[in-house]
Amino acid sequence: MAELKNDRYLRALLKQPVDMTPVWMMRQAGRYLPEYKATRAQAGDFMSLCKNHELACEVTLQPLRRYELDAAILFSDILTVPDAMGLGLYFEAGEGPRFERPTDTIDAIKKLSIPDPEDELGYVMKAVSTIRRELNGQVPLIGFSGSPWTLATYMVEGGSSKTFEKIKKMAYAEPAALHMLLDKLADSVTLYLNAQVANGAQSLMIFDSWGGALSHTAYREFSLRYMQKIVDGLTRFADGRQVPVTLFTKGGGLWLEAMAETGCDALGLDWTVDIADARRRVGHKVALQGNMDPSMLYAPIPRIEEEVGQILAGYGEGTGHVFNLGHGIHQHVDPEHAGAFIKAVHAQSKQYHK
């Protein structure tokens, strides 16, 4: 493997000194870029793009050609794992992801098998190894998965949900069934992420998109407990260096201390959290990633630069901060505004790393 030319992102996650704050964006390879839209049209549809390792590599690299980002993230989807479990994933126009066979009974859960990441998810591993090769040491490659709770919400509901009625009913009326599902998912995700590391991923991120829908106690029981199980089972050293792990619960600002106790290296913050407060609470234990509101990228460029300055000042001096948005970049953002955001982070952050 080529030697890493820019390891700023990995160093910040491990709270090692850096010359400036590293930056990348969730969904940086995506619908806001015209070149992405062209590649997706070439693939035919979203899942065909995910399953073609050469095209998945192409869209992963597209934002790096435009911007001086400090990391690449594998182009894939969090629902690859449930799809590999045989649920029949498809995408409906305007409706988002749907499953032909929802996992909403204990009998359906019992029948689920844990997918072999090199077999049923081999297309993801081929994408990881291709991207790692093509990056040629330019920046590190982030691998990722959805959290067990988040994957379970789609599997039980049969797709996206605003109320989470079916899975919450299962959580409170049939908790043993949900725990069985979450346990299988935790095992599947651990294997999946470790296979990504074996194929070249240099950092890992777990997206708990829907953990914030849970009550205070239910979050610990149904979400955090299973992310903890994954963290305990991950490969944390490869290619002669540590493989940092970031946990991100959208709407998880209440639980930062508990998340930091899992042994992860970093926590992702959404835009509702004050980064200065988050650093006071957990910054001695973990690095922090975030957390500008993605909608700020619609603002005039001087306002974007001002917001970047405020967040950098909120975190303050020293390492342990990876700048990011508080969630994925919106599809209608002007790519020039994204570029101005990235430049502002690098330019304004040097003063905090003397």
Swiss-Prot record:
It comes from Shewanella oneidensis (strain ATCC 700550 / JCM 31522 / CIP 106686 / LMG 19005 / NCIMB 14063 / MR-1). Pfam families: URO-D. One of its GO terms (molecular function) is uroporphyrinogen decarboxylase activity. Its EC number is 4.1.1.37. Keywords: Cytoplasm, Decarboxylase, Lyase, Porphyrin biosynthesis. Homodimer. This is Uroporphyrinogen decarboxylase. Substrate binds at residues 27-31, 46, 77, 154, 209, 327. Belongs to the uroporphyrinogen decarboxylase family. One of its GO terms (cellular component) is cytosol. It is found in: Cytoplasm. GO terms for biological process: heme biosynthetic process; protoporphyrinogen IX biosynthetic process from glutamate. Its main location: cytoplasm.
